[in-house]
Amino acid sequence: MRTFAPWILSLLGASAVASAADATAEAPSDVVSLTGDTFETFVKEHDLVLAEFFAPWCGHCKALAPKYEQAATELKEKNIPLVKVDCTEEEALCRDQGVEGYPTLKIFRGLDAVKPYQGARQTEAIVSYMVKQSLPAVSPVTPENLEEIKTMDKIVVIGYIASDDQTANDIFTTFAESQRDNYLFAATSDASIAKAEGVKQPSIVLYKDFDEKKATYDGEIEQDALLSWVKTASTPLVGELGPETYSGYITAGIPLAYIFAETKEEREQFTEEFKFIAEKHKGSINIVTIDAKLYGAHAGNLNLDPSKFPAFAIQDPEKNAKYPYDQSKEVKAKDIGKFIQDVLDDKVEPSIKSEAIPETQEGPVTVVVAHSYKDLVLDNEKDVLLEFYAPWCGHCKALAPKYEELASLYKDIPEVTIAKIDATANDVPDSITGFPTIKLFAAGAKDSPVEYEGSRTVEDLANFVKENGKHKVDALEVDPKKEQESGDATETRAASDETETPAATSDDKSEHDEL
């Protein structure tokens, strides 16, 4: 199961929050402020719009503000407007747009073609992403615009395919459409341009502003092969990890090796020293440097001591495995090279972070830790409802008394376990995208847990267990009093939920503390 810890993104962006928190809103702005009265008209009048739905008190919104502003200025000359909507003032508009957290960024091509912005929240990333959105999936290349197109983005993929090769053209176009959010694509059928670039038709060339500057693919034009090649060719031999690059690395499908260093000089030195190792293992593992002064806390998530640098660790998101390198040893390329090879050869046991297994279970909710996860969650014939929580999570704290009440319903029902695990203190083999996350591991189907997305009330959670569990236990029927009380809970739910989100929906089903 592929999984990673998305809350790391908050660590990678945390340093920006404080510096941006006091940014003034009085200066002239290229970001257009819209209201319920102006939003629809503005969107209809523009072919492409990026909209931010925010709240003034939101820390992540404050951190984004200067980057969003700068991106708006850079995109203004390209006629790509960036707008913002204050959801504390425009609740109805935000509710209509399905806003469930802050900030929410959405791309509009008119009112009926809306999709979420899925790039990084950095100026360069926003500009790059929106420029790609403004272009066709595949831009035409001519002798006159070739050099311009090659440098339009950090990564540009150009297909040199003859016009009569319909199969290759169709596959390349389909591939470009599927990846247009990630890369800028162009193509030409002009054989003279291909010859000038030193390639034969059909070939795909990836131009980049780092390493060897370009890479050529002359294999079979096939979707999966192209995707694998583009991902590998577009990744620096030794990159720099930050908020704008984290997601790409962690979803690449191969292990990620981290080199933590506190100074720019150290990171540059490690980059040069590790290039030959990165070249040797290209396509099998990615290697990055990371600023330990800004993001050193992430070392703790890799089971390293976050106070001792330089440091090295490998993370395999596909297996949710972590391999910290012995911090008593110096980080030397030769030794690390052997360590990497041993990890790839499965000769190194992964490190598992776990709290101590409780000597006794106190209270109705079963406490799970990494070392008891297999026994309590997976290796049994029970329906197990498991909450993944974080101690600092406000929504988790609000859920706690209701979750305990839920667990009390099942205290005499051996077929069902209501459990929780601190996902910040234990390595968990599941994909967690927010806190709290609640999953039901049904007996006989432990490898395909069902995530709960409903309202967090006792009766709704109990019904979820009944409907999705193997044993179909109806705890409310066992406790008729609870069933009688469910009507009162339903009546009060809407009122309490209005304080949870900007869009006052009927429940709090999508509420997570932002990660």
UniProtKB/Swiss-Prot annotation:
Residues at the catalytic site: 58, 61, 393, 396
Paired cysteines (S-S): 58-61, 393-396
Placement of sequence motif Prevents secretion from ER: 512-515
Keyword Transcription regulation: no
Region (Disordered): 472-515
Main localisation: endoplasmic reticulum
Site, as annotated: Lowers pKa of C-terminal Cys of second active site: 456
Site (Contributes to redox potential value): 59-60, 394-395
Reactions it catalyzes: Catalyzes the rearrangement of -S-S- bonds in proteins
An example Gene Ontology molecular-function term: protein disulfide isomerase activity
The keyword Electron transport appears for this protein: no
Residue ranges constituting the Thioredoxin domain according to the UniProt record: 21-136, 343-470
Domain of life: Eukaryota
Pfam families, per the entry: Thioredoxin, Thioredoxin_6
Function: Participates in the folding of proteins containing disulfide bonds, may be involved in glycosylation, prolyl hydroxylation and triglyceride transfer.
Listed name of the protein: Protein disulfide-isomerase
Annotated gene: pdiA
